Amino acid sequence: MLFTSTAVAALSGALLIQPALAAPNGLPSHGGSHHGPKDPFEVLDPQNWVNPDNMTWADFKSPPGTKWNDPSRKGSIRNFNIALVNVDYPDKPFTITMAPGSDVFKNPQPGSPNVTRSQVPAFYRDFLNKPGKLNRGHTLHEYWMEDSNGRFGVDLTTFGVYKMPLKSYQYGIGESMNAGACPIGETCYYEIRDDALGAWRKDIGEEKAKSFELVFILSAGQDESSTWQEFGEIMFQNKEDVTSAFGPPPGNGTGNMTLPNYAKTRYVEWTSWASASAIWPNAGDGSSTQAESSGMGTFAHELSHLLNVGDNYNNPYGKPLRRSYTGPWSMMSRGSFNGPGGPHTRWQVPPLQGGSMGSQHTFHDKIRLGLTTKDSALNISREALANSGLIVARVTARVIAPKPGDLIGIHVAMDKDKSPKCDVNTDPYCDGNGYQNYNVEVIDRMGADSFCPDSGVMLSKTRDKAFSNYQWTIDANPQDIKQVDFHRPDGTPAMISLGDYRQLADALFHAGTRSGSQYEYTDKANNLQFYIIEPHRDEAGVLSYTTAVRYVGGKDPHKRGVKLDKNAKITSSNTKPTDKGVTCSFTLHNTGTYNPAAGKAKHPQDVTAYLKSDVYRLKATVEGRGWRVEVPNALATAEFGKTVTVSVAVGAENSAQDKAKVTLTATSEADPSKFATAECKVNKFRN
């Protein structure tokens, strides 16, 4: 099987830069205020997704209290001992050794360092794995240390440069991907590993070569993954418009001039020959191939393959078309494209923008690869949930190293996926059926996740043993995101396809009402309901969410109950109903009792501590002409025997009646027959 890191790229000059839909930081506001915010109607947890094209290095934020790029700190379990084998060709030197903008792709970029061929091995070793000015201190070692909470690091030893015996395109042109592109009279489809690894082993000896766990082959020039679109349909209106500069080499008596300037490529019918003739990054048998345009996200993605985890992405232009699987949220999906400037800058050398900082691995992949401890996962069973009652748990952002007792994910195992069958050939939103689990995880825009489009909660379905298409993000906003991808040469806008990974930029769930996202998700067929109850961001800046999972239709073992105190208070002190509004604060009591028998339900682990709460749905009404109400959060949770404060925002027009009565109803989600009501009286002239 070919494992590849793929791209949807475009020339920056041809792009329509899209505005972010909200504030650029993507960070939810502090939740849980019980004293009324300055604006009682303020949205608790707004969805502030950001278009990757608009991101800059200013979006990067270090996880609090960390210095994962410290080269003196090694992985507590292992440091990957990796050889970096640098190779160039008779027809293609390393781009970084050339004058700025001098190759056909206008690389290297202005301001690039002046590097000689003999300096190439050290340059790319340092660029990839030594904190410095050019890479802004970001390294492969940093990525894996952060992603694994200090368990795995990277040691990189560099070799070469080795001159390959054949021309670059004889290795780069693939037999199936680029059929018909080999210059007439020449032979292509050669495996770069044979000559690259052969030269390396001959140089250092078999015994020393065997001392390395893995090998990165770094090929001079571009990779096809990062150039096929931008130097294809983005630059040229039609394939016949591709200029000779991007075509095959001039004829030398072998008839090469009969080849067109375009060629077949992986995802669409054509690209320029110059793009098609480059290698496509891939991994297998202990080695991976990359090129100079391959960012650190590509190296991290290919290293993941070498650890025996597969791709989880689609063809964004496939026929039939399918939605992206996990999009920008997963290193094994299009998260490998993440970085400032978005995917359309991945063609640049050196790779300092798109693809330079891929996302973290998902919670599913972290468990699979041993990047986190099992203690940081809450493992529950859907079937046991029917007998134990709902579970409430606080989940911390996956970028944060969990402390003892902290969770970075919830894993809900199912004995069978009961979802109705769907057909991937006719429905682009079909998940393919046959999943074994649901996962809940929190993503925050810091560390390697800084260039994810949003902060919030990701729900996904996963398969245990599948090697590809094994995880499917539940999209909180499944509608077409309707963003322009680029402009064609004639000025026609090309929209992001339904299969484009950026369709999932607004997929995360958020707490509270009016967020632009959703705060709950129900899978009726699988009898599961998920709740996003409240966001929390502590003084250090760590993001977490209180979440809950309930079996729909089970026999709840607990006695449920709820009470609202009658003396609701107006807790806003600096505003009036006719200004920003006021807050009515209600005291909610969980009057239910816990049944110890629930702890005997056969979950994969002891979940007793998470069974001792209920979730309540809040609804508010108001009596009075010209008045309005809103519950900033339609959900609340409280442990058995405990109380919490819940809020209702109340506002009035200047012409409203002088007084109004607000009624709040709180209903148990576990047992809707248990509910309580209380009133709050307000006067538009007083706060």
Swiss-Prot record:
Coiled coil: none annotated. The lineage of its organism: Eukaryota, Fungi, Dikarya, Ascomycota, Pezizomycotina. It comes from the Eukaryota. This is Putative secreted metallopeptidase. It is found in: Secreted. InterPro entries: Peptidase_M6-like_domain. Its EC number is 3.4.24.-. Glycans are attached at residues 54, 114, 252, 256, 379. Disulfide bonds: none annotated. GO terms for molecular function: metallopeptidase activity.
